[in-house]
């Protein structure tokens, strides 16, 4: 439920956040979002009940949706027409990198001091980030030419493309989440200890921190994003479907991270192709509203498959199917273009 409290604002506020871009700057909105993340941490520090923890998660969720939308827009503004896929990959991979650092650092802080110190550290980090963005960030000069009067609403063709791009991103992320949720169970069924199984599955997340940027660089250099995407999806699907062959588990997890998850930046680059620059703030709000609505049910469907069959492999087959439909959705996006 606390996880849901964090994600709920994304469904409700993504579109209004897109509206907000008409009235204030990206810099101020990101600063406010980071401050909300810090405030959520403060509420968690002083929380003494479930309701207070839920409130902390909601406040953090508000900050998350604002920063997600406008960090994406800021990167798009700076790198549109340049090495956009690479830049988007670096942005996207910063999230699992932060999670990985938190998993290590926060556990150490909690063991050395108190569990509240993890929230203290995260809140301080967000405050420093807010200060840095507010004091240092400047909109690129070329963006000023078309963002001084950002427009609300999207023409029908841009709305269609934005929803399709969101579908591609949502299916891709949903497949990854299902893999993280049920991959270890497949390995445990094959004889691994739970701790070892979780460590092997996590290898994909570690290597994708580097493979995403490399894949984005290759896409920007050779200008073949669709070919690269389909090759990566094929590798990802193969690694998922072969996961029950647990003697190859390490290699399959590495393959999934190195190849299957590599095209994240390539997919996020679709956002700039779906909408005009002066409608980007609102359009990315639409993009993430659709993303949250589409991706949220996937873990529940995977859980239902597991509960119904008692076999952890079926959710993995579901994840592979989601990756297959990523390719289909991308093809429809190109057709609609």
PLM region spans:
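Helix-to-loop junctions at the C-terminal end of transmembrane segments
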Residues: 13-25, 212-223, 306
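Extracytoplasmic gate region of multi-pass secondary transporters
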Residues: 161-202, 206-212
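Cytoplasmic membrane-interface "Motif A"-like loop-to-helix N-cap segments
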Residues: 23-33, 220-233
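C-terminal transmembrane helical hairpin of 12-TM major facilitator-type secondary transporters
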Residues: 225-270
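Helix-loop-helix hairpin linking two adjacent transmembrane segments in secondary transporters
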Residues: 90-137
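Cytoplasmic helix-loop-helix junction between adjacent transmembrane helices
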Residues: 56-94
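A late C-terminal transmembrane helix in Major Facilitator Superfamily
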Residues: 274-311
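Conserved MFS/SLC helix-loop-helix module at the cytosolic interface between two early adjacent transmembrane helices
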Residues: 12-48
């Amino acid at each position: 439920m606390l996880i849901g409290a964090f994600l709920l604002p994304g469904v409700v506020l993504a579109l209004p956040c897109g509206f907000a871009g008409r009235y204030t700057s990206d810099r101020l909105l990101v600063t406010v979002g980071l401050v909300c993340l810090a405030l959520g941490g403060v509420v968690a520090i002083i929380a003494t009940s479930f309701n207070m923890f839920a409130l902390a998660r909601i406040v953090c969720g508000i900050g998350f949706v604002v920063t997600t939308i406008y960090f994406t827009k800021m990167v798009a503004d700076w790198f549109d027409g340049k090495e956009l896929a690479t830049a988007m990959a670096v942005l996207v991979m910063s999230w699992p990198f932060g999670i990985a650092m938190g998993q290590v650092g926060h556990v150490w802080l909690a063991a050395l001091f108190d569990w509240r110190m993890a929230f203290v550290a995260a809140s301080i980090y967000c405050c420093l980030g807010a200060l840095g963005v507010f004091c240092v960030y400047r909109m690129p000069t070329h963006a000023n030419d078309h963002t001084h009067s950002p427009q609300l609403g999207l023409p029908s063709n841009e709305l269609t493309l934005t929803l399709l791009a969101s579908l591609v991103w949502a299916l891709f992320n949903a497949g990854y989440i299902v893999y993280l949720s049920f991959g270890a169970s497949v390995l445990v069924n094959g004889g691994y200890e739970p701790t070892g199984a979780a460590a092997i599955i996590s290898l994909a997340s570690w290597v994708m921190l580097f493979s995403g940027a490399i894949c984005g660089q290759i896409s920007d250099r050779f200008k073949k994003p669709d070919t690269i995407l389909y090759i990566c999806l094929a590798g990802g699907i193969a690694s998922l479907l072969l996961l029950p062959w647990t003697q190859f588990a390490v290699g399959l997890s590495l393959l999934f991270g190195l190849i299957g998850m590599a095209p994240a930046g390539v997919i996020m680059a679709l956002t700039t192709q779906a909408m005009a620059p002066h409608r980007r703030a609102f359009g990315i709000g639409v993009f993430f509203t659709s993303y949250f609505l589409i991706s949220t049910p996937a873990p529940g469907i995977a859980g239902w498959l597991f509960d119904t069959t008692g076999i952890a492999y079926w959710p993995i087959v579901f994840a592979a199917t989601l990756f297959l439909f990523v390719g289909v959705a991308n093809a429809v996006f190109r057709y609609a273009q």
